């Protein structure tokens, strides 16, 4: 006789994603990859005209959709171009162009930062935006310290079985993530194409306070 050890309710509960988690997060963002993600299947922003003022809020929203109620303490932005924007809470790291060194500069710089964050236990979560599977060892080492690593991804992450067949390297990298944080290319492009003022938004003075 075949026994059904699980009720339908418990089966459905078993299929649910992990419980929502909280804590602090630091984002390590490969600018080159983020632009590619925004341009995926559409015309996206140019590298030299990126608006990063709303990036933190955008990433917090994406993390929330992945079941992560976290605050972003800081963003590290790894860019090949000279950046003209100074954004609070964002540190720019200049790296060599991928065409000139095959991404070695990014691999070394971002990898060292990830290792230091893990060793110092500076945060509970790291959001990583890159598609370079050479980070697998660095990610695994960081996770062994208890740090949770989440990776920014496109819609392809919703079908991992197919992704492993179409892009094995990208699939292996995403499989290592504690959470895959999916963003829509259109929404990302719209955020990055926003008005990129070189100065922080001005706060309107309250006339009552002035008096």
Task: Say what each PLM segment does.
Residues 2-102, 155:
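Domain-level signal for Mg2+-assisted phosphodiester chemistry and nucleotide/NA-binding surfaces
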Residues 82-211:
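Nuclease catalytic cores that cleave nucleic-acid phosphodiester bonds
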